[in-house]
Amino acid sequence: RSSDLKKTSVFIHGFNFEYAKNADWKWISANLNKALCIFVLSQDFKNELIRRGIKSDIHLTSTKVPDYFISGFDLSMRQGKAENIMYSGRIEKAKGVYETVDTFSILKSQYKDLTLTFVGDGSELPMLKQYVENKKIKDVRFTGELRGEDFKKEYINADMYLFLSYTEGMPTVVLEAMIFGLPIFTRKVGGLIDFFENGKMGYISSSLDPAVFAEAMKPYIENPAKMRSVSIYNSEYAKTHFVASVVVRKFENTLKKYIEL
């Protein structure tokens, strides 16, 4: 009986466009169209589902940062210093880690006090360390995987965030970096495209060219007032859009509309 059927919503957390090319969309559509609604992390994902014949309502949502993660962080500490560039996440080629090193190498030749910190572990870590050693690049630090307060300290000690991943859904690490007031330098991938404001939040581009990102970062390194302005904007924006309590409340309000039908 239809009254016995459970109302179901679907949250699609990742999306592989290459896989989608050869997927069984007849089967996928038949099942997804049974859902009351679907949540995805970017407008591109939503557009692809619609193009493939999904008729259920599709809503954009976000990954989230736990409210407690930023407890004790004082935004006033961001005074425009630009010395430590940070990357966090899996150490894999597809995360743009080599491009990150090359971007830093370009900048390091001009700004001698710059440092680069990699937070994370992955299959590419030994090769990346060897790459840095072979190129004789100084002041690159690898922390390995960190959690909790140790991870939080790295965000606090960083000044800029460089994330050149090839593909993404909605990278939580970028949202975390924003909450901690870091200017973001990243690529047009996944859900970042839907909200990122070039100039106000840092820099976003489709490019994978390290020279492009090095050039984009120079005005920030040389202008403490610009760094400070972006730090404040990013932290406030992220607190009002990406902390768990905000994301969950919006999620619940959307679902309530369907429950009340």
What are these regions (language model features)?
Residues E145-L146, K153-A158:
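Short alpha-helical donor nucleotide-sugar binding micro-motif in glycosyltransferases
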Residues E83, Y87-I106, L116, S123-M127, ...:
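A conserved mid-protein helix/loop that constitutes part of the nucleotide-sugar donor-binding site
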Residues E197-G199, Y203-P210, P219-P224:
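Conserved acidic donor-binding segment of nucleotide-sugar-dependent glycosyltransferases
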Residues Y166:
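Aromatic "clamp/platform" in nucleotide-sugar-dependent glycosyltransferases that forms part
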Residues K129-L146:
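Nucleotide-activated donor-binding/catalytic signature segment of Leloir-type glycosyltransferases, i.e.
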Residues V212, P219, K226-H241, V247, ...:
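A short, well-ordered alpha-helix in the C-terminal region of glycosyltransferases
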Residues K7-H13, F17, S29-G72:
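Donor nucleotide-sugar binding/catalytic pocket of nucleotide-sugar-dependent glycosyltransferases
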Residues P183-T186:
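Short hydrophobic beta-strand element within catalytic cores of glycosyltransferases
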